[in-house]
């Protein structure tokens, strides 16, 4: 809030609970960029409160959550958009145009690979959450567990209570691009390996 105030002169109201924000502010549009395990509940609540929703990928923690999100926005008559930045990046769009032009010839198979840092890490001891952080609210619909700095800030994607790992984080982008290009609704086969010892 202080940074926004320094840049604009306006100081936004702060809320610790999204439900209070929805009730008091009655926003027309909500942007959800919270950890993945909150996406479904917050999207459904925002749609039911009368807001259009832009939600970062992945939509939900499970297929059932994602379906519930779609149903809630349909029932409310509001629009939901999922944040997939590779749909709008100029090099991705031009690459898609090239692939669809037929200039690459007949494509018989598509494979995607995602590689990244991984492997064993030294465990960090649990600790108290940072001052001012409501750890119970952060955990929300996930099982309450002790705070650990491997989870927050930024590491939540490696913990399945909060996200779906690398496949749910980066795999969403790669799978979406192939489905976008091929105009298929679903992959025919998915095989994934990985993990931490």
Model-found features: residue ranges?
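N-terminal Rossmann-like dinucleotide-binding module
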Residues: 1-9, 86-89, 99, 178
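N-terminal glycine-/serine-/threonine-rich beta1-alpha1-beta2 phosphate-ribose binding loop
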Residues: 1-55, 61-79
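Local beta-strand N-terminus motif with an aromatic residue
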Residues: 27-30, 104-107, 187
């Amino acid at each position: 809030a202080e940074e926004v105030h320094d840049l604009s002169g306006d100081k936004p109201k702060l809320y610790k609970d999204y439900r209070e924000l929805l009730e008091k502010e009655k926003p027309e549009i909500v942007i959800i960029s919270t950890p993945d395990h909150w996406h479904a509940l917050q999207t459904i609540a925002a749609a039911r409160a009368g807001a259009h929703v832009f939600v970062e990928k992945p939509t939900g923690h499970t297929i059932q959550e994602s379906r519930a999100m779609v149903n809630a926005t349909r029932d409310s008559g509001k629009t939901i958009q999922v944040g997939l930045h590779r749909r709008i990046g100029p090099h991705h769009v031009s690459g898609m145009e090239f692939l669809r032009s037929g200039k690459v010839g007949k494509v018989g198979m598509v494979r995607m690979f995602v590689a990244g840092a991984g492997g064993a890490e030294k465990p960090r001891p649990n600790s108290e959450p940072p001052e001012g952080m409501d750890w119970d609210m952060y955990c929300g619909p996930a099982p309450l567990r002790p705070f650990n700095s491997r989870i927050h800030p930024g590491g939540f994607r490696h913990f399945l209570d909060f996200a779906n790992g690398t496949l749910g984080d980066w795999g969403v982008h790669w799978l979406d691009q192939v489905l976008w290009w091929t105009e298929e609704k679903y992959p025919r086969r998915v095989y994934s390996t990985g993990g931490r010892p």
